[in-house]
Amino acid sequence: TKDDWMRLAPRARYWRTLAPGGADGRPSASPGEGRGKRRPEAWPVQCLLCAQGCVIPVGGRGRCRTRMNVAGELRSLVWGRPVTIHVDPIEKKPLYHYLPGAAAFSLATTGCPQSCQFCQNWEISQSSPEDYRVPLVQPAAIAEKARARKAPVIAFTYNEPTVLRNT
């Protein structure tokens, strides 16, 4: 279900809680910690992944729509969920004379922190993760698929690639 999908989204990196005394990437208290204790308040968080620096209230998302504040903890809704995978010639990428003639294993997730007026990939970049139902794909499986297709390059493309970064 949609709730399970969001609940199971991995904890994102590159954020900080805006709770008093909070530290980067960690809520100031763990929800439900200790038996019989009152659940601490959830706080807004600030995403530090890109230059937007989105301040995200509980239940809200950043401008890219790929990160969500779930009970005071930032979650990545796109990690391991590429919506498109293609093998492209490396020359299609904005890389000058890098491995000429090689294949690039290209993948993208939904979402983008930018709203470029003439984006040729707007159907992917301006959509939200729940617009596509895709199974979870582990990074090792992506690398194996690239090897099987004899693609020495993995390219995060079709949208701003920082939205996929979670390590």
Give the location of each predicted region.
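Extracytoplasmic thiol/disulfide redox context detector
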Residues: T1
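N-terminal juxtadomain amphipathic helix
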Residues: D4-D24, G36, W43-A102
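Intrinsically disordered, low-complexity segments enriched in serine/proline and basic residues
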Residues: D24-S30
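N-terminal polybasic/positive-inside topogenic patches
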Residues: G32-G34
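Conserved Radical SAM active-site core
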Residues: N69-T167
